[in-house]
């Protein structure tokens, strides 16, 4: 399990999900699992090794299967799913929740969200967001810039000219991601993503000048929210 969490409200905003039912405000519900799950095997009656921390995705296959079940069997499997109290159940392809789903959602306090996306597309989007938000991370003293599409982390002692180097690169058409404090997240085994803490984003501190808002002085094209780390100097 990740030591970090992300609110269901942020995930819903990122994936453009709509609410069918929620027991409380979505920003009060925290998600800690980096994976999502299609509960087809659980709906077939196999409940072992079910990870209730994952968001559950119900697509056309699962919904078609539920339609073929008898009322009593459908209720049994749906109640079992909701009784695990996952952080949310998401219906894809614009499908509406069954009346039984709404009943058990209210009984067990499980949010039901809806998406118009295809199931695989939504799962990919959610996993990407979860991997970014829940990734292991560290903060390093340095400057992160994008030079010809490559993310370059400039390290060194205080006062050696890291920020001055970065601003000269910005003047030449390259982009600033973070100055002074660089937050590095390992979003996959092969990718480290660098960004700036929100309170200092787009700012750079220069000797003899002070703090400069790079986005205002050089335009929004001179800054970037994040960049993958390709080189350390």
Please state what every model-predicted region is:
Residues 1-81:
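Gly/Thr-rich phosphate-binding loop signature of adenosyl cofactor/nucleotide-binding cores
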Residues 48-52, 81-85, 146-147, 225-227:
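Flexible, charged surface loops at secondary-structure boundaries
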Residues 85-88, 94-129:
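Charged, amphipathic alpha-helical linker segments immediately N-terminal to NTP-binding catalytic cores
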Residues 129-149:
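P-loop NTPase nucleotide-binding/switch module
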Residues 149-177:
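Glycine-rich phosphate-binding P-loop
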Residues 178-231:
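Conserved nucleotide-sensing/catalytic segment adjacent to the nucleotide-binding pocket
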